[in-house]
A protein has these predicted regions:
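Short aromatic-glycine-enriched beta-strand elements
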Residues: 136-140
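Surface loops and adjacent helix of pleckstrin homology
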Residues: 141-143, 154, 181
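A short macromolecule-binding patch
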Residues: 147-152
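Short nucleic-acid-contacting surface segments enriched for D/E, G, S/T with interspersed K/R
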Residues: 153-169
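Mixed-charge, low-complexity intrinsically disordered regions
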Residues: 1-126, 131, 158, 169-248
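Short strand-connecting beta-turns/loops that link adjacent beta-strands
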Residues: 134-135, 145
Length: 248
C-alpha cells in the first residue's frame, strides 16, 4: 500500500508545522525513516557499489577495529550514518544519500521524497547536553559553534549526561530529524581538547582549500573528526595533529 494512501504525507505535513509532536506521531515518523533507510541500505548492498562499500568500511573502521558480524551491533549503526551522509562515492564524489536522491527521486513515494530532502539538510554535529527538561527534551550545545539546541531525550538513558559527548547528523528546522547518534564519555576538559584538535585539523585542511570553513571541513572529512574523538577518548594526551603542520 503506498504510504501516501495511509495518510503519512498528511502526518508529515502536520509535523512540519507543529511546535511539538506526540509520541504516537514520533513512532510513525520513526517507522517511515527506518523503512526508507532500509530501502537505501539494500540499494547500496548491490554489486555495483561493492567497491565503495568496502572502501568506506576501511575508512570508517581503521586498521585496528574488529568488524562485528552482528548487523544490529552499534558499529553498523554508526557506519551507516557515516556512509550515507559523509562518504564520497568513487564515481561522482557525491554522498550516497545525495546520489540515491538524484537517481531515485522520481520513483519513491512523496513522503519518502520529503524525508530525503530533509535528511540532505542534516549536518554533522558534535554536541553535549546541558540539562534535561521535563518534557522529554534535552537542552544541548554545539561544541564548535556554541549554538543551543533542543533535542528529544536519547532512548538509551542519561546516566551522568554531563560527562558525555555526542555526535551525528541533525536537521533542526521543520521536523527535527536525527539519524544514529553516537555517545562517548568526555569530561569538559576532554571536550575542549577535542575541539582544539579538530580546529587544528581544519587549519591543516585550509592549506589545501584556502577558504574552507569548519562546515566545509566537516562535509569533506567527518570521518577524521570521528577518529579524532575516538583517539582522544582512549588516549587523551596524544596529539592527533603535529604542531609542525600548522601554518604559523
Amino acid at each position: 500500500i503506498p504510504q501516501d494512501e495511509l495518510g503519512y504525507d498528511k502526518i508529515y505535513d502536520s509535523l512540519d508545522q507543529a511546535d511539538g509532536i506526540t509520541p504516537e506521531d514520533a513512532t510513525r515518523l520513526n517507522v517511515l525513516l527506518e523503512s526508507l533507510l532500509n530501502k537505501i541500505g539494500i540499494y547500496y548492498k548491490s554489486e555495483e557499489f561493492s567497491s565503495d562499500f568496502n572502501r568506506a568500511l576501511s575508512l570508517y573502521a581503521g586498521p585496528f577495529t574488529v568488524i562485528p558480524e552482528n548487523e544490529n551491533d552499534d558499529f553498523w549503526l554508526g557506519f551507516w550514518d557515516y556512509f550515507l551522509f559523509d562518504y564520497h562515492l568513487i564515481c561522482n564524489d557525491l554522498s550516497p544519500l545525495q546520489h540515491f536522491y538524484d537517481t531515485n527521486k522520481d520513483f519513491v513515494q512523496q513522503t519518502e521524497l520529503r524525508i530525503l530532502q530533509d535528511l540532505l539538510k542534516a549536518e554533522f554535529t558534535v554536541f553535549f547536553i546541558n540539562y534535561v527538561r521535563d518534557d522529554d527534551m534535552v537542552e544541548c550545545t554545539n561544541l564548535f559553534t556554541n549554538e543551543h539546541m533542543q533535542l528529544p531525550q536519547p532512548d538509551y538513558g542519561l546516566y551522568d549526561y554531563r560527562k558525555v559527548l555526542l555526535y551525528g547528523h541533525i536537521y533542526l528546522k521543520g521536523v527535527v530529524m536525527l539519524n544514529y547518534i553516537t555517545s562517548v564519555p568526555a569530561s569538559k576538559n576532554l571536550r575542549n581538547r577535542i575541539k582544539e584538535e579538530v580546529v587544528r585539523q581544519q587549519q591543516v585542511y585550509r592549506q589545501q582549500e584556502k577558504s574552507a570553513t569548519l562546515d566545509d571541513f566537516f562535509k569533506r572529512h567527518a570521518v577524521a573528526v570521528r577518529h579524532t574523538i575516538d583517539i582522544l577518548v582512549r588516549l587523551a594526551k596524544v596529539n592527533v595533529v603535529s604542531p609542525n603542520l600548522l601554518v604559523r
